[in-house]
Structures are given as C-alpha cells and as structure tokens.
C-alpha cells in the first residue's frame, strides 16, 4: 500500500525552477485569466514569454489552464476553448488547425499505483493537425490522435487513435471514417 511520506517530485520534473513556476501561476491567475476574450495575441505573447511554442493566429481562451507552458506546442490556427485544462507535466503538442473544445482535459501525468511512494510520471500527448476534440473530452497520458480525427463530446481517450476517423465513447472507439465534404 502507498506511503505518501516518501513521495517526492523528481529533480527537473517541472522543467523550470520554483520561481519560474510560481511566477507563471501568478501570471496565469491574473493578467492571463482577466484578459478580455478577444485578446488572443496577448495570451499567445504571455505563453511565448514562458517558453511555449505558439503558431500564428492561435485562439486561446482566458479560462484555459496550463500547468507548465514551456511544455506546450500549439500549431498555426489551433483553438483552445473555455475551461480547457492542459496538464503539461509532460509535453503536449496540438497540431495546426486543431480544436480543443471547452472543458476538455489533456492529462500527461499520472502516478505508479504499484509504487509504495506513489511515484509520479509523465508521458507526452500529441494531437495531430485538423483534429477536433469536442466538449469535455479526456485524453490520457501517452495518447496520440492522428491527423483529421474527431473525438465526440464527453469521450475518454485512453489509447492512441488513427488519422481521419470519428470516435466517441468511454473508452473512445472508432465509429466511422471522417470524409471531407468540400
């Protein structure tokens, strides 16, 4: 059984020193979160200032939560909706023209349940280009979602998904191919 008295965060795990982490959290809770909806470039600037790789014309809502922006890459024209949580203990990459809809949660971190000291770990998440994660989708550590894939509302993605398909469910399963109409 677990004994949390022996838990510790591995050295370098956060990717930044304690001052950088606390400064980001203060900025995120104030001038990032309080900025008007339309100030997408302002929020992109703040994220770049803290080491995020942000493409052009990215839409990031002010209520988005990002644990460590220096572990985030957003492609050109990516959209990140209201109340999305990007739990960047590990790297998160969101491809160009992809949409992460409101209340979705991308979780790169977990704990080893077999470890007595509940060891923390992180595995990257990659969302391909031209994807759409609909409202309230959960994406687990280590998942890759192929280019052009749609994940339906309130789905949970625990395994990687192929390109150009429509998926839904808990766990998410492929329903059909995604076919462009234009």
UniProtKB/Swiss-Prot annotation:
Pathway: Slime biogenesis; slime polysaccharide biosynthesis
UniProt cross-references to PROSITE patterns, sorted A to Z: HEXAPEP_TRANSFERASES
GO terms for MF: O-acetyltransferase activity; O-acyltransferase activity
Keyword entries, A-Z: Acyltransferase, Lipopolysaccharide biosynthesis, Repeat, Transferase
Annotated Pfam families: Hexapep
UniProt record, GO biological process: colanic acid biosynthetic process; lipopolysaccharide biosynthetic process; single-species biofilm formation; slime layer polysaccharide biosynthetic process
EC number annotated for this UniProt entry: 2.3.1.-
InterPro entries noted in UniProt: Colanic_acid_synth_WcaF, Hexapep, Hexapep_transf_CS, Hexapeptide_acetyltransf, Trimer_LpxA-like_sf
Enzyme class: transferase
UniProt similarity note: Belongs to the transferase hexapeptide repeat family.
PANTHER family for this protein: ACETYLTRANSFERASE C18B11.09C-RELATED, SIALIC ACID SYNTHASE-RELATED
Name the record gives this protein: Putative colanic acid biosynthesis acetyltransferase WcaF
